[in-house]
Amino acid sequence: MPQRTFLMMLIVVCVTILCFVWMVRDSLCGFRIEQGNTVLVATLAYEVKR
């Protein structure tokens, strides 16, 4: 029974992570912080290889 509980917990965590990534998929490649006159921007650059 504990193995089944662990498996269900793992499935719930994975589904939650997938839903979160799906909701914020457009903003995963950039990060922006503004504080007063200072702006910090970090951008992830990647290329798809085929």
From Swiss-Prot:
Q: Which Pfam families match?
A: HOK_GEF
Q: What is its main location?
A: membrane
Q: Where are the transmembrane segments?
A: 5-25
Record's keyword terms, sorted: Cell inner membrane, Cell membrane, Membrane, Plasmid, Toxin-antitoxin system, Transmembrane, Transmembrane helix
Q: Where does this protein reside within or beyond the cell?
A: Cell inner membrane
**Per its UniProt record, what InterPro entries does this chain match?**
Hok/gef_toxin, Hok/gef_toxin_CS
The entry's family comment says: Belongs to the Hok/Gef family.
Protein source organism: Escherichia coli
An annotated GO cellular component: plasma membrane
**Protein name per the record:** Protein PndA
Q: How does it sit in the membrane?
A: Single-pass membrane protein
